[in-house]
Amino acid sequence: MSKDYQKTEEQFRSAMAECRALFAKKLHDYGPSWRILRPSSLTDQLFIKAKRIRSLEIKKESLVGEGIRPEFIALINYGIVGLIQLEMGFADTPDISADEALAIYDKKADEALQLMIRKNHDYDEAWRSMRVSSYTDFILTKIQRVKEIEDIHGATLVSEGIDANYMDIINYAVFGLIKLS
């Protein structure tokens, strides 16, 4: 593994650790309340976060005092929640413990890492030459694709499914987080 690839993996792991720490704290405060979210609501939550990033990038000003970094963290965590919900389905009430939620979170985070490693090899660190605003636009595009796939009830002809789009959202958001560090 080249030094650049190794650095990317280390930065990715560090960013994911930051996201996991916040996820664990929110699990403590709220429990796995997100288990109630239906797919369309989760997609809209991702949209709100990405749209706010784009708005802040364009306006260069936040009136609520939070910047772009927390929104990338939210995209990563909600992306992982999305993967969990795809696997488990939504529930009427939270039906897993915080420990179970963290174990599943870790599994999905590792799947995202492994995908990033494979893609980073094939794309040869291209993400490092990209603008953060491009990650934002790509994330918004992925969210729009998820909406379309949801609207046709997953009956795609040639496209990847919702899970692949969530993975890409997570990875682009991690790249954004790294670039803003």
What residue ranges belong to the model's regions?
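Intrinsically disordered, low-complexity regulatory regions
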Residues: M1-S181
